[in-house]
């Protein structure tokens, strides 16, 4: 007889259920892979040069959290620690003129900025991305504020997502439409202020509660609009660039980090090559500017070549000069305007970052790292030191402390951490 049990074919949920307006690339390539249909895609859809657009992790909307953080605006001191510690950029802070919130949804929270660094009338909001949060609770643990009458209540508290999902989705959509506050008016050297800068690393596939990603996100907040990243293989290359999406994204002007992953052992040299290439392109662009000074205008040409670009204000001014230069090149009769136009963006100084874990920095890539450190070039090196090979399951590295138990050192590591 019949058992009466029906076995249904497994069905992948549609990743596009909550997404209505996506770029063609995401619709044609990314979403089918999300839905488990990557094997049906023709090779002709793949990028011929291997480059993929940024900002595609925002379309995943994984909805994996059972609870999400809820901001208590009355208790909050606006310290920014919840935003700083969030591994997935699922809590955002933004400063804006109070008038910008006149059409906000009724449940959208915002309060006057406590810092005297902002103009009168500036408001601040802390907003959760409910469908991108992993529910790890790092934000609650980081919050230093307790209600004196109820110590279990903080300025950020976890709450079940079900009754909040629709309203917080609407609140997030409004929050993201608010204009980004002037970067030049924000202090970059304090956590409360720096957390008001838009992150250009969001919604990665890193483990819930990851301790690595906040540092990468912070780097993108400070330098992301001109950032070149050489990423060693490991956790950071998996959550940073695994198909079909990337958490690196762009700002409102379309600028964001350029990210690439090369051989594990060659990452330091790879990043050094980015620095040398960026410097050479800048030198070449400056030479063309000097040659065309008569067409461009002597004052503009001199200002571009001698621009100080160590601070936000200098970078802002140089971007304005480059925009003006490109306008002039369109009308130029000089035989080389197209050539200069193709390299004009390199007149803006790039921030080169070499990123990897301790397995790369202490072990497999140490020789190259030592070589790069000994050279006088301007590179930034971020070592995500977890003291084991995290991506492959927790094996001992030379960063593992003496006596620590890890894979390959079950009896405790016999030697001290490499200095």
Task: Annotate each PLM feature.
Residues 1-133, 140-353, 404:
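Ferredoxin-type iron-sulfur electron-transfer modules and their immediate structural context
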Residues 80, 137, 213, 366-367, ...:
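Residue-level marker for well-ordered alpha-helical positions
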Residues 239-240, 339-419:
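Thiamine diphosphate
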């Amino acid at each position: 007889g019949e058992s009466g049990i029906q076995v249904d074919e497994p069905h992948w949920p549609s990743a596009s259920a909550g997404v209505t307006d996506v770029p063609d690339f995401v619709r044609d390539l990314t979403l089918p892979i999300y839905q488990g249909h990557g094997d049906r895609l023709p090779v002709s859809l793949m990028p011929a040069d291997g480059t993929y657009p940024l900002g595609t992790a925002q379309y995943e909307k994984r909805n994996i959290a059972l609870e999400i953080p809820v901001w208590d605006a009355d208790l909050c001191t606006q310290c920014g620690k919840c935003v700083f510690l969030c591994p997935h950029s699922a809590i955002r802070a933004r400063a804006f003129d109070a008038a910008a919130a006149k059409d906000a949804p009724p449940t959208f929270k915002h309060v006057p900025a406590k810092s005297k660094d902002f103009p009168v009338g500036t408001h601040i909001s802390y907003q959760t991305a409910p469908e991108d949060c992993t529910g790890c609770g790092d934000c609650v643990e980081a919050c230093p504020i307790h209600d004196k009458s109820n110590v279990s209540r903080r300025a950020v508290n976890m709450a079940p997502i079900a009754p909040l999902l629709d309203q917080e989705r609407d609140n997030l959509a409004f929050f993201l439409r608010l204009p980004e506050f002037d970067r030049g008016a924000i202090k970059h050297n304090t956590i409360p202020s720096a957390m008001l800068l838009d992150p250009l690393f969001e919604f990665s596939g890193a483990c819930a509660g990851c301790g690595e990603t906040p540092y990468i996100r912070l780097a993108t907040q400070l330098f992301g609009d001109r950032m070149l990243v050489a990423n060693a293989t490991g956790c950071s290359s998996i959550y940073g660039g695994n198909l079909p999406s990337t958490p690196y994204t762009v700002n409102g002007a379309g600028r964001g980090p350029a990210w690439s992953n090369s051989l594990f052992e060659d990452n330091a040299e790879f990043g050094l090559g980015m620095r040398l290439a960026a410097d050479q392109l800048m030198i070449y662009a400056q030479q063309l500017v000097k040659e065309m000074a008569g067409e461009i205008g002597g004052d503009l040409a001199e200002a571009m070549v001698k621009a100080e670009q160590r601070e936000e204000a200098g970078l802002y001014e140089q971007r304005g000069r480059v925009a003006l230069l490109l306008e002039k090149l369109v009308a130029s009769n000089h035989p080389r305007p197209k050539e200069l136009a193709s390299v004009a963006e390199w007149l803006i100084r790039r921030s080169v970052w070499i990123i990897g874990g301790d397995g790369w920095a202490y072990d497999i890539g140490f020789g190259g790292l030592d070589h790069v450190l000994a050279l006088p070039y301007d590179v930034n090196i971020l070592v995500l030191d977890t003291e084991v090979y995290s991506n492959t399951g927790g094996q001992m590295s030379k960063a593992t402390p003496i006596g620590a138990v890890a894979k390959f050192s079950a009896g405790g590591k016999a030697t001290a951490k490499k200095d």
